[in-house]
A protein has these predicted regions:
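N-terminal short beta-loop-beta anion/metal-coordinating cradle
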Residues: 57
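Short, well-ordered beta-strand micro-motif
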Residues: 69-71
Length: 177
């Protein structure tokens, strides 16, 4: 008979698209209150100029992108719960039903990046409460590899540098356990 075991904790990241820095600061404060210290941040860049102005109407202006990782590792079975929590933060700052900040949590393990989403499609795995998990990138032969559905920003050298550094931090944490 197959035996089950607990999942190994993984590195929580949150991708953020925002326009208003006050809302960004407040949302990050809430995230830190829930998940603790941030141990790595990507460069800030214009999501609107480099990828898409899709969020600009909701955000109230040019969307800026940053990705954060949290020091404490987290059980990946909490992915749906964490996405619901980040959705509640988006709702807290929304105006007339429009998000003023977009928060996308995910997990880095030694071999992959998962992102949580509410968007249903054939390559996403249902978790619970309307939340899906997406394998966004996988690590093999010393590099990140994309899939046909990988978002363009996650394919970029800039974001992959951040992910590689975060993965290295995570691998160091695994040896401490």
């Amino acid at each position: 008979m197959a035996k089950t075991c607990e999942f190994e904790k993984e590195k929580l990241i949150v991708g953020v698209v925002y326009h208003d820095t006050d809302i960004y600061d407040s949302a990050i404060s809430i995230l830190k209150g829930e998940f603790g210290e941030i141990d790595n941040t990507s460069e800030v860049f214009s999501f609107s100029k480099e990828y898409s102005s899709y969020y600009d109407g909701e955000l109230g202006g040019e969307g800026m992108r940053i990705i954060l990782s949290f020091k404490e590792t987290v059980d990946p079975s909490r992915q749906a719960e964490i996405k619901l929590f980040t959705n509640s933060i988006e709702e807290k700052f929304s105006v007339d039903g429009k998000r003023r900040i977009n928060l996308d949590p995910g997990f880095i393990s030694h071999g992959r990046l998962l992102l949580a989403t509410t968007k249903k499609t054939g390559f996403r795995i249902p978790l619970s409460d309307g939340i899906y998990s997406e394998l966004t990138l996988f690590w093999a032969r010393g590099a990140w590899h994309k899939l046909p559905w990988t978002y363009r920003d996650y394919q970029s050298e800039r974001v992959q540098r951040f992910l590689t550094k975060t993965r290295k931090i995570y691998l160091g944490q695994r040896t401490e356990i």
